[in-house]
Regions:
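Short coil/turn connectors at secondary-structure junctions
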Residues: 56, 73-74, 105-108, 144-146, ...
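Acidic active-site catalytic centers that drive phospho-/nucleotidyl reactions
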Residues: 40, 63, 80-83, 87, ...
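DPxDG-like acidic metal-binding loop motif
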Residues: 71-130
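Short secondary-structure boundary/capping segments
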Residues: 27-28, 52, 67-70, 112, ...
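Residue-level signal for inorganic ion chemistry
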Residues: 18, 40, 51, 85, ...
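N-terminal subdomain of lithium-sensitive/metallo-dependent phosphomonoesterases centered on the IMPase/IPPase/PAP
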Residues: 1-82, 256
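An extended, acidic
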Residues: 137-257
Length: 257
């Protein structure tokens, strides 16, 4: 098993690439509303090299090199080098690095780093969730009226999911205190784990978006599933909803199906 302190150190070092964002000006278009910068590439190259040297037996899956064959029954690193690339391009400082260690469809270790606030979230299966060394827990809200939610808009599939997503968002907004849109699913899931927001949902996420965050949420006492309440497993693409058990159940039952 990978050493947690070593992994945290690698992620913290990689965070300097986001803070020094001049290279973000070099942008490649991957698809509709889908971009990659030199920062994404530098973070992934750095982390793949560091992880490969220390743990050569563990497979690697990164967003910027996601076409390799992966055996998810074995150990695999799952990395989003910059979750919130569009934010990075605009210098809207809500981007993160998300790293998970998975095996057999389960996340064993999850780390999310927000370099602009220097907040490092981590969780190890069965050992709780932490923020900069402090144990964190999901909120205790029981009703929608108590809640502030975060959401994502599935911007890469606007034509397919745009109208549906905003119908769901509207229903949640009308019954809750308020809603927020950060542009980084990993941050939103981490902040759900910390109880700062009461729940998060997005129609279509990739495995590198949710792999670390789902462990943070579950180890903080919450639930993270797809919109139907099904386990996320190792789905390459999935809807994701998370929150404390009561709020998660409300979202699945009344708002997202």
């Amino acid at each position: 098993m990978a050493e947690l302190e070593q992994i945290k150190d690698i992620v913290l070092k990689a965070g300097t690439f986001l803070k020094n964002r001049e290279a973000a000006g070099h942008i490649t278009v991957k698809g509709a509303s889908d971009y990659v910068t030199e920062v994404d590439k530098k973070v992934q190259d750095f982390m793949q090299k560091e992880l490969g040297e220390k743990y050569p037996e563990i497979q690697f899956l990164g967003e910027e090199k996601s076409n390799e064959e992966i055996d998810f029954s074995g150990l695999v690193w799952v990395l989003d080098p910059v979750d919130g690339t569009t934010n990075l391009i605009h210098d809207y400082r809500r981007s993160s690095i998300s790293l998970a260690l998975m095996e057999n469809g389960q996340t064993l270790l999850g780390v999310v780093y927000q370099p602009y606030t220097d907040e490092l979230f981590w969780a190890k299966k069965g050992e709780g969730a932490y923020l900069n060394g402090r144990r964190i827990h999901v909120s205790k809200a029981e009703t929608m009226e108590e809640c502030m939610f975060a959401f994502g808009t599935a911007p890469y599939d606007k034509e397919k999911f745009g109208e549906e997503s905003f119908r769901k968002i509207y229903r949640v907004f009308m019954d809750s205190q308020d809603i927020r849109r950060s542009g980084s699913a990993a941050i939103d899931m981490a902040e759900t784990a910390a109880g700062r927001i009461d729940g998060f949902f997005e129609r279509k996420l990739s495995i590198w978006d949710y792999a670390a965050g789902r462990l943070l949420v579950s180890e903080a006492g919450g639930r993270a599933t797809d919109f139907e309440g099904g386990e996320l497993g190792c789905a390459m693409k999935s809807s994701v909803v998370c929150g404390n058990p009561a709020i998660h159940a409300l979202l699945v039952r009344k708002y997202l199906k």
